[in-house]
Structures are given as structure tokens and as C-alpha cells.
């Protein structure tokens, strides 16, 4: 039900992102098949970063839904070239970004679907956007992905500075999928206890950072360090890492609450080119 309002949206760019098991790829496949049936002789290009990953993933997803719709026997399926021709002469072409020469040879593209969009780069996306130059109406690029780091191009381009013009963004999680087996739901709930960061990304579909974190259970909040220290169960600690030209000098001031196992960072400094007397 959460997807139905977006069945016929007209924005040029549509992002379906969120947690694993949310059903977003299923809906997008069904949505695009219906669009291809509505517009005869239309061409849909389906993209993943690596062409070798297409056959067992999104290509098979389209085959599955064409079968469920009772259309597969009326389609011409070219397994060698990963191309599907629909009864009304619309077609679906599956390609990998890692095969740029073959991409250049494709003409008349009317719509593009990018599966696992976080795997490609902004340059890849820009080139794909330039491929939409036919005269067909309602040309669209649809992106599907599970969020990763906020350093990824998807976050920086689509979220960091607000929603861009002519863009529709849809966020869903496994809570929106009524067809999940209980065993899958149980595994996600177990992840919530054992690995909160993975749960945040893969279950809740939020942007986060997966690796190279010393502390992953932190938050920003206002506090008075003097009041915290006055409670008597904290110890003040200060850390200093010397640097100069290539690396900055880093200083951190914190309070350690050993009873409740909390660490309060209340001051820090990070700067290159400091001399010893300036540090002091």
C-alpha cells in the first residue's frame, strides 16, 4: 500500500531506498513493466555496476514478474544478450556500467532503472542521464538502493542539501512489507540486539558508516561538563597526538564515567602547523 501513490509519478528522478526486505525492487519491477505495456515501442535500460551480477539479480526479478503477470510466453527473452522484448515491441535491456563501450552503442533509451545505485559513481550517473535523449514522453530514471555511508554520492547528491528539483524520494523498511516470513523478521530483530549499526542500515534503511569506527554508539547532545564532573563518579582525561605538516595535532578533553560506562567529550582541537609553544 505504501508504494501505490508512486505507481504513476511523473518526476524525472525517483529514488526508492530503505532497508532490506522492504519490497522496493519488487514494486519497481512491476511499476516499470506496467509503464512499458502502456507505451508501445519503449526502451528501458536496467543498470548495475557489474554486468556479471545482473543475471541472477534484477534480470531474474523481471523474469519472475513477467511470469506472474502471465506475459512471459508472449515475450521474446534473449538470455545471451540479457534483453527482453514485450508483446507491444517495448524492450528491457540489461547492462553493467563496467561495459561502457556496449552502453554507448545503445540508442533510443526512454527510461533507466539503476539497481544498487550506491555501487556506481556520480560520473556514472551523469553519463546515464545524458543517455535519455529520445523524444518519448515522461522519461524517467529510477534508482533503488540500500543506504550506506554519508560519504557515498547518493547521500551527497540527493539528501545533503535537500531534495533536488523534479525528484521523488520514497523511503521504506521491512515494516512496509506484509509478505515477509517470520523467520526473516526474527533475523532482523536479532540484528538489532547484536549489531545496531547494521540494523540501522539494513533494517531501518538509514545512512550510516559500517566500518573503521572505534565508537558506534554515540550521539551529540548539550551538557555542562562541570555539572557532569561534580557528580563525583567521573575522571577527567586529556589526549594529545602531535602533528605538524602532513598530519594535524589533535587534542581531546573528556570525562569518563566508569560507573555507567559513559564517555563525555567536551572539548577538542584539530590543526596543522602548530609549534609546541602554540600547543601549550
Question: Which residue ranges define each predicted feature?
Answer:
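Inter-Walker segment of RecA-like/P-loop motor cores
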Residues: 53-110, 207
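Nucleic-acid-processing active sites and adjacent nucleic-acid-binding tracks
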Residues: 253-280
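Walker B catalytic acidic pair
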Residues: 115-116
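Walker A/P-loop NTP-binding motif
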Residues: 25-40
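ASCE P-loop NTPase helicase motor core
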Residues: 119-192
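Conserved RecA-like ASCE P-loop NTPase motor core of nucleic-acid helicases/translocases
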Residues: 42-54
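Pre-Walker A adenine-sensing motif
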Residues: 1-11
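ATPase catalytic-site recognition across NTP-hydrolyzing enzymes
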Residues: 177-243, 247
Amino acid at each position: 500500500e505504501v508504494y501505490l501513490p508512486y505507481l504513476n509519478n511523473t518526476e524525472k528522478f525517483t529514488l526508492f531506498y530503505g532497508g532490506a526486505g522492504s519490497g522496493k525492487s519488487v514494486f519497481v519491477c512491476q511499476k516499470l513493466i506496467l509503464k512499458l505495456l502502456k507505451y508501445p515501442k519503449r526502451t528501458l535500460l536496467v543498470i548495475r555496476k557489474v554486468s556479471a551480477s545482473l543475471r541472477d539479480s534484477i534480470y531474474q526479478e523481471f523474469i519472475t514478474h513477467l511470469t506472474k503477470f502471465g506475459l512471459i510466453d508472449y515475450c521474446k527473452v534473449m538470455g545471451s544478450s540479457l534483453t527482453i522484448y514485450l508483446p507491444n515491441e517495448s524492450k528491457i535491456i540489461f547492462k553493467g556500467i563496467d561495459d561502457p563501450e556496449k552502453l554507448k552503442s545503445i540508442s533510443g533509451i526512454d527510461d533507466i532503472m539503476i539497481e544498487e545505485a550506491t555501487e556506481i559513481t556520480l560520473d556514472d550517473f551523469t553519463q546515464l542521464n545524458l543517455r535519455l535523449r529520445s523524444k518519448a514522453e515522461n522519461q524517467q530514471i529510477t534508482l533503488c538502493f540500500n543506504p550506506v555511508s554519508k560519504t557515498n554520492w547518493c547521500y551527497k547528491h540527493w539528501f545533503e542539501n535537500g531534495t533536488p528539483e523534479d525528484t521523488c524520494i520514497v523511503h521504506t523498511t521491512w515494516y512496509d512489507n506484509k509478505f515477509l516470513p517470520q523467520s526473516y523478521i526474527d533475523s532482523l530483530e536479532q540484528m538489532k540486539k547484536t549489531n545496531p549499526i547494521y540494523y540501522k542500515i539494513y533494517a531501518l534503511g538509514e545512512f550510516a558508516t559500517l566500518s573503521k569506527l572505534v565508537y558506534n554508539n554515540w550521539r551529540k547532545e548539550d551538557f555542562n561538563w562541570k555539572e557532569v564532573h561534580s557528580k563525583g563518579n567521573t575522571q577527567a582525561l586529556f589526549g594529545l597526538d602531535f602533528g605538524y605538516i602532513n598530519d594535524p595535532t589533535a587534542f581531546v578533553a573528556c570525562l569518563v564515567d566508569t560507573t555507567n560506562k559513559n564517555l563525555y567529550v567536551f572539548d577538542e582541537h584539530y590543526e596543522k602547523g602548530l609549534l609546541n609553544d602554540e600547543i601549550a
